[in-house]
Amino acid sequence: MNFLYFIHQRTMVAVKIFPCEEFASWKNESQIFTDANLKHCSILRFLSAEERHSGLQKEYWLITAYHSQGNLKDYLSRNILSWRDLQKMAGSLVSGVTHLHSDYTAGGSPKIPIAHRDIKSTNVLIKNHQECVLCDFGIALRLDPSLSVGDFANSGQVGTARYMAPEVLESRVNLEDLESFKQMDVYSMALVLWEIASRCDAIGGKVKNYEPPFGSKVREQPCMEVMRDVVLYGRERPEIPTNWLAHQGMHFLCDTITECWDHDPEARLTAHCVAERFNLMEQTDSWLFNHVWVVKYTNISLCMEEK
């Protein structure tokens, strides 16, 4: 797969080029993007999908908005974040996942929920104001209730091993419950939130160099067998150092992350619940940090009611 960047109608655009053998991925991503209900400020803006000829070879183009800051992983490798930067990045990421998972658009129109199935920091792009947009929907799945268990089973076991939830690594996903696919996304989202938190200067002291989740435990591209040992059997998660908890906002965020990567899928927060927490933190920042425990337990109660 290749990428091009060029000026189209006086605007820089990005072109994702799929070779013939990746037609299925192009087709799936095109179908996801052409759903008008997908449009959202935290979802990569789609422009067009085209079939092109390069000599005797066919190739398939996906044309989208261009974001010069690149992906989240590279951005975090280059930059240290303020608390405000973290709030914008994490909040916009959560907002995008919430929109994907929702049964309704922000305007109240019904929509089919979508599971991304490959949330990771390289599949998140950075806009100019330190806000995130989700991209790469090549293996995304429409959670259409009219589909059968067999249809979902045929969608295959996909994703990136480092970011796979325990139940995916164990091949024990409950295909009869569409919420299972959302729960897997929430686990992966929690790892990305941890990556963002790890580069925030609100923790005090020296901010460590960027490393991916489980970076000190596994090699650069770990296989599923290795991740099973770490995540499934060892029940390990990325470290949350104690100095992160000295900042009340970070403490609140870390509690949320921990609840999102719970080993039990049913115990994880929904993306909607996480979005509500971020909205509350944004709207009542100073009040929240002075009363974090009261708000925490109140909000957990609300989330449990939602489930």
Where are these regions (language model features)?
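The N-lobe alphaC helix and its flanking beta3-alphaC-beta4 segment of protein kinase-like domains
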Residues: I17-S48
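Regulatory extensions flanking the kinase catalytic core
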Residues: E266-K307
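Conserved C-lobe activation region of Hanks-type protein kinase-like domains
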Residues: L169-E239
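Glycine-rich ATP phosphate-binding loop
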Residues: M1-P19
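Structural motif in protein kinase domains
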Residues: H67-S77
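Short beta-strand micro-motifs within the conserved protein kinase catalytic domain, predominantly
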Residues: R45-Y60
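Activation segment/activation loop of eukaryotic-type protein kinase catalytic domains
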Residues: T122-Y163
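Catalytic-loop of the protein kinase fold
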Residues: H101-K127
